Regions:
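N-terminal interaction modules that seed assembly of large macromolecular complexes
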Residues: 3, 7, 11-63
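Structural motif
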Residues: 4-10, 75-84
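Short, surface-exposed acidic
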Residues: 26-33, 70-75, 98-105
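Long, compositionally biased
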Residues: 49-82, 96
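Short, solvent-exposed coil/turn linker segments
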Residues: 55, 99-100, 124
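Low-complexity, flexible helical/coil segments
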Residues: 67-70, 88, 109
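Long protein-protein interaction modules used by eukaryotic assembly/scaffold proteins
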Residues: 84, 89-106
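Glycine-rich, aromatic-bearing surface loops/beta-hairpins
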Residues: 112-141
Length: 141
């Protein structure tokens, strides 16, 4: 799937939201679950929504406020590049399939995305999403 410039920008923004959340010290498992089920994610999933024109700082603040998240110094730490890719690939997945963020996260939570990162970040985004969907479908069967 070839994304247009606007869609590609949305993928990069979501990736940077995940990166900023990690830098700010949020528990990323909780943050990603909150993000993927948030009104901000619903806006990014929509055909058109003002959230699509917001920067990553605004999107992050929106999710943090909605979910009432606070930084957690004791939270498990993850590789920041893997988190960046997770944000990117979740948004790409939504564009590719039309699935809402909430449904994607329910099928393939952050732990699963991070577990496939070492091999999947080196293949095309299309193939990575197809493989993640196949894994999720095998697991559900």
């Amino acid at each position: 799937m070839k994304l247009d410039l606007f869609q590609m920008q949305q993928c990069w923004i979501q990736a940077r939201v995940f990166e900023r959340a990690d830098k700010a010290g949020y528990d990323m498992t909780a943050f990603v679950a909150a993000f993927m089920g948030s009104s901000a994610a619903e806006g990014l999933d929509a055909d058109y929504d003002r959230m699509q024109w917001a920067g990553e700082a605004y999107v992050l603040e929106s999710v943090v406020n909605e979910a009432k998240l606070v930084p957690d110094a004791a939270a498990q730490k993850f590789d920041r590049e893997a988190l960046f890719w997770a944000g990117f690939i979740y948004r790409f997945w939504s564009f590719k399939t039309g699935e809402p963020s909430r449904a994607i996260h329910a099928r393939f939570p952050l732990a699963d995305v991070l577990s496939v990162y070492p091999g999947f970040h080196t293949i095309s985004n299309d193939r990575a999403v197809e493989e993640m969907i196949a894994i999720a479908e095998r697991r559900a069967a």
